[in-house]
Amino acid sequence: FEEWDDRGRRYGILVAAAAWHWVDPSIGWRRAHDVLDPGGWMALLGHVVVRRPGEPEVYAQTADLHERYAPGNPDWGHPPLEADVRTTDSGWGLVEDPGDLFGPTVVRWYPTVQWLDGDGFADLLRSQSPYRRLDPGAREPLLDAIAERIRTRMGDRVARRYLGVLRVGQRTS
């Protein structure tokens, strides 16, 4: 985005879906402002894995396995509570604020849930960075143990909750 040749074109909307955090913050907001028409809109889409109080949560049921196969990993831990994530319902969330380049944001939340069996949950984890970074000699036994735990202690059905968020702001003059 930072080096993209816009050929002088201007746009009514610019959308970044789970990618804005990769854009150089010293360039990104100014560049977004400059490629938008006056009054154009900037939209950031993202999501967070969340949990709800009182609902069985996979990490709580498998913390001992995580520590057995990959002890001390700083990536392990409970997802945040959905209600806590919703407190970030103003501004641009966790990315750097654009200052006066954009007006006030409109924020909308979209909760979704994905139901998985033990094998499906292990396959999902295989695609995620904290697990991909593990040595396969630790990763595969850990994921096999997680799948087995889900099958035997959680009825072979777990929820993976996501809270999608849309943050939209209009370009200022």
What kind of feature is each model-predicted range?
Residues 1-2, 168:
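Portal/gating segments that form or line small-molecule/metal binding sites
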Residues 2-14:
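A short acidic, Gly/Pro-enriched loop at the edge of an enzyme's catalytic core
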Residues 4, 22-23, 46, 69, ...:
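Tryptophan-centric aromatic hotspots in well-structured domains and transmembrane helices
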Residues 7, 54-58, 120:
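Short aromatic-enriched loop/helix-cap "lid" or pocket-rim segments at secondary-structure transitions
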Residues 11-26, 48:
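A short SAM/SAH-binding and catalytic strip from SAM-dependent methyltransferases
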Residues 26-40:
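A short glycine-rich, Lys/Arg-flanked "PGG" loop and its adjoining helix->strand segment in the class I
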Residues 37-112:
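Conserved catalytic/acceptor-binding region of the Class I
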Residues 83-86, 90-173:
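Conserved Class I S-adenosyl-L-methionine
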